[in-house]
Amino acid sequence: MIKQASFITSSANKSNWIDDDVSEICLIGRSNVGKSSFINSLTNNNKLAKISNTPGKTRLLNFFEINKGEYRLVDAPGYGYAKVDDNLKIQFAKMMEEYFINRRNLKGVFLLLDLRHKPSNDDIMMYQFLKHYNIPVVIIGTKLDKLKKSEYVKNEKMIKETISFYQEDDFVKISNLNKTNIIKCYELIDKLLGSK
C-alpha cells in the first residue's frame, strides 16, 4: 500500500538525479496512455502527477518519494508523440538509455499500454529493449473501462502477440476511473522491490 507520496524533483541530467540507495520503480508509456492518472490512482492523490493537455511536453524524469523514503516512483516522459521534433526525441532516447542501463536504484519498470489499441513500434521497441537488458518489466494495460467485456481477452491477446510478450512477465489490466486492479499493482511493486 501507498500511505504517503510526495514530489521530490524533476531532472533530465544524470548529475541531478538523486544519489542514494533508495529503490526505484519507473513508469513509462506513450503520450496520453494514462500514466499521470495511474500515478494519482496508485498514490490516492489526484494532484500528485500533473495531467498535461500537451502530449510530449514533459521531457524530464519526475521523482516521487513513497512512504517516507521506502522507495520512489519515477515518472518518465511519454514517448511517440508525432509533433515532438527529432532533437527532443534523441535527447529522450539518450536520457532513458542512461537511466535504464546504468541506474543502480532501478528495480523494475511498469510499461503502460492502452488496451484499446495495437501497440506501436515504439511500444514494441521499449518492451524488447527492457527485455534485452534483463530489466524486470510489468505490462500495465490502461483504460479497461473503455472496453466492452467481450474485448478483454481478445485485446490482451492482441497486445501480447504484438509485443512478443514473455510469459514470465506480469500483465495487469487497470482502470484509473474505478481503481480496477490497483491493489494488484501494489503487490507487483512489492515483487519488483524484492527481485534484485
From Swiss-Prot:
GO terms for biological process: division septum assembly. Keywords: Cell cycle, Cell division, GTP-binding, Magnesium, Metal-binding, Nucleotide-binding, Septation. The keyword GTP-binding applies. The keyword Metal-binding applies. Residues 21-195 form the EngB-type G domain. One of its GO terms (cellular component) is cytosol. GTP binds at residues 29-36, 56-60, 75-78, 142-145, 174-176. Mg(2+) binds at S36, T58. Its cofactor is Mg(2+). Pfam families: MMR_HSR1. One of its GO terms (molecular function) is GTP binding. Necessary for normal cell division and for the maintenance of normal septation. Belongs to the TRAFAC class TrmE-Era-EngA-EngB-Septin-like GTPase superfamily. EngB GTPase family. This is Probable GTP-binding protein EngB. It comes from Mycoplasma mycoides subsp. mycoides SC (strain CCUG 32753 / NCTC 10114 / PG1). The lineage of its organism: Bacteria, Bacillati, Mycoplasmatota, Mollicutes, Mycoplasmataceae. The gene is engB.
